Amino acid sequence: MAYEEQLDKIINEDGFIAALDQSGGSTPKALLQYDVDHSFYKNDTEMYDQIHSMRERIILSPSFNSKNIIGAILFEMTMNREMNGKKTAKYLWEDLGIIPFLKIDSGLESEANGVHLLKDIKDIDKKLENAVSNGIFGTKMRSVINSASIEGINDVVNQQFKLSHQINKHNLIPIIEPEVTISISDKENAEVILIQSILKNLEKMPKSNKVILKLSLPEIPNFYQPLMKHESVLRVVALSGGYDQTNAIKKLECNNGMIASFSRALTEGLSINQNDEEFNLIINKSINNIAKASKT
């Protein structure tokens, strides 16, 4: 069964999870990094066509394969489109051996208590059923922590874990992402509160439920080791969070057992103006460097 094979791969294989799920407000930034400015599109439909073309170019590049990449996180619109004549998630798994995940959140609430909670996810069960029918293995939801607020961080973690129970019921594996903003002055304190809150929620989880944790690279190396040892945690992955690729890799190398799930740091240096040879050379180098750092 594909699910059992994917589960084994997520737990045991070397490599990283590519984050290709830019959406909404983050799409223009991602396109600008790729040298696609507003002159390339007149409306949202054309903007999403441009981001899909970029993602397709990445996924179809020769180095985007299961040698270094365990999984890929997709935006819903990408999941609903095709690559090489197949729905994207099926193409990733059946042709490349890469596990597909789906970003399911609907964005963030306004900041309160130093954090951004998730907006209500409308028709979540329908969304999860659709994910399963498209061959998706797991989901991802991103919250943001801007302050070492005990109340705020507990709210973020509690909300994420509550949703994770619902996701597990659909036989999907949730990636829980409570991102700590890298520029805040009390980041280390926020991480202390965060790990305590996550451990409390893990202890309350049914033993059959499993999660993946996607966390900002910590101030103290190997700080998240206790989470990696928990029986309910399949993997702890790192977001790049605004660090450039060089710094993200350096920080990742200091955290044994943590693997990358980079977005901006993965696509760094890519441009619509590059020919295929130039493009493939850069993405190949990035994939190899990120995969190497994920093996420490």
Q: What is the role of each PLM region?
A:
Residues 139-174, 179-214:
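Eukaryote-skewed repeat-based solenoidal scaffolds used as protein-protein interaction platforms
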Residues 1-137, 145-148, 190, 197-215, ...:
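Alpha/beta catalytic barrel-like cores
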